[in-house]
Amino acid sequence: MSEINEWYMNIQNIVDDIDRCIKSGDDEKLTLGRLSKSLGYSEYYVSRKFSEISGMNLRDYMRYRRLAFALRELRDTDKGILDIALDYGFTSHEAFTRAFKAAYGITPSSYRSHPVPVILRTAIRPFDCYLLGIGGTGMAQTNSDIKVYFVTIPAHKFLHIRNYESIGYYDFWEKQSHIPGQDCATICGLLDSIKGKLDDMGGDEADSGSGQVMAYINEPEGRICSWGIPLAEAYGVRLPADYSGEMPKQMQIMDVPEGEYIVFEHGPFDFQTENSAVEAKIEQAMKDFDYEKSGYELDKTQGRVFYFYHDCKRYWKYIRPVRKTV
């Protein structure tokens, strides 16, 4: 393993360790000294490498992650504010309030009374991003079959940002990063704070486990994709059809009517070694599917939405809009 590869993995291990300690309430282990010792490097060197790779100070990252977990409890439970503060390593109600307001511009009590969208510090995934950038560390074959089935999805709303020119996940976020307030960290943090997401499985990362999905919307102004369909790429969350909560100003929301979809699904996979193989396998399955025999065809009507769920702990799943041909 190269030194660069090794340090991306080291920082990823630190990030995972931080979340484990916060979740378990093991605050004594959540120190720079212990994290550095576990890697066999000095505190100074680990701090420097963390900042270099993640783009932020390690102590700041730990504080923001504590606040992100605390905010979810404020939003989703009736636990007392002081109890939440102490559970997440703050010494008093006042210390928690100061840190919370400095991070989100609102006090914990005001947020609980009126939970507006705020930018949470989602868990960073430096090693995953590095692997995607270099195409992974291997091309292990996946032995799982692709499941193909049809579903009817009820009417819902889709809160999102969109881009009419991007080509794929990385290009999407690269282009969005040049739009004020629409970079990946800001958007994922805002979406993480939204309550009531239909696909939220309680995950702590900015992926399908926390309800965040990539989508492709049939739009005549969009780029022509490899399937010959003009699409706008989008990123957001599905919400109930009657959702009436506040909406971040840089996002848009659309009504998605009830419709029929075809699903191409691969089960859990190892991101580091199987991601590329899973992508190739599921792309081939979509290419080979015989729509004529099924009695369905892809629905290219403007506004139909094609969802992409990527959560290596559960599945890789494409959900494409269809309509009956007979």
Language model feature labels by segment:
Residues 111:
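Winged-helix/helix-turn-helix nucleic-acid-interaction surface
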Residues 77, 99, 103, 114:
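Mid-sequence acidic-hydrophobic segments that form the walls
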Residues 1-48:
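Glycine/alanine-rich phosphate-binding loops at beta-alpha junctions
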